[in-house]
């Protein structure tokens, strides 16, 4: 049985993990009888957004606690991940990836990724273990791995940010994936595009299948 780590960033696309992207990822992994462990940072979100009005709320919310809503409580803090214990890593998107797992949403090409997440991503990369990234999450890979290699990923139709981060960006529709065989990366744009839910699901399904295929070639 394969073991896959999934990192999420809260609950809700405006300030946390994109719920559809996360659920589609978990569903497709379950279809392949994969042992999944879900992780999230144990710290407060950058901010909290009312998903009905899309306005900021005057409250604080812990990322791990919020993420537990999607994980049905079966979740661990980010510092529990050890790359050696898993066959692959997958990162769904949402604004949480741009604000809680990085500061891309604030600094664009000048963004950084927290040291703990950097070490996790580099750990999987150094062990040649495949990494899947969805929506805005491929930009995290570009930030973290730019001092190690030049990667190929996608954010969908517009990849200017990826190019500014020193990576190669490929145009891709929601139902397809971009594969970087050399660096063992698989990406799909999902909600970076205004596409039907069925197409987004198809793209994530393809990503999961390709990541699992890569696991057998480690």
Regions found by a protein language model. Give the residues of each.
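Active-site-adjacent pocket-lining segments in enzyme domains
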Residues: 5-31, 35-37, 74-76, 80-218
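A short, charged/proline- and glycine-enriched loop
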Residues: 1-2
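Glycine/small-residue-rich loop that forms an oxyanion/phosphate-binding "nest" at active or ligand-binding sites
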Residues: 60-74, 82-84
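N-terminal beta-loop-helix "entrance" segment that forms/cooperates
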Residues: 39-64
